[in-house]
Amino acid sequence: MDVMEALVTRRSIRRYWNKTLPAGVLEELLEVARYYPSGLNLQPLKFMSVAETEDVTFVTENLRWAGYLPGYEIGVDERPVSYILIFGDRQISNQFDFAAGSAVNQLLLAVHGKGLGACCLAIHKKTQILEHFRLNAQRFEPLYAIAIGYAKHGATTVDLTSNCKYTLDENGDFIVPKRTVSELTIIK
């Protein structure tokens, strides 16, 4: 798949098959992650791969899934098999927005390129994540969790007509409205 195809076909995946990733995939993704663009080349992010069942369960239960779908819960048999957690390192910088956005996109595309599914979820329960992994709260700020696994559902895009909320079709696949190019373009 070429880069343009990857950019257009990558969708967020929120349900996964319980199938182990091939050996070395998380390490390869971490290697790719380190090339994220960073202002002043500060590289203020740290990454943690999470693959132990207990840790994956903990992270899954401390994230908010599919916020537009009231009552949506990810089934025990549909959880991702791994995560890459992204942290800001305050010993390097207190500004993470640009770097985190770049790193997230880099990882999502790399996962897609491996034929896997992924979803980026903001970490809101920062204290719980820090305590569970015994990390220094003064130094590290939990930012995002990239859920990774084999996709158990599909996702298609449609032109946005009324609102941007995604929905599920009769097969449980996500329908994701996207703004048209003309709606996104500023003409002077």
Where do the PLM segments sit?
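Acidic, surface-exposed loops and disordered segments
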Residues: 1-188
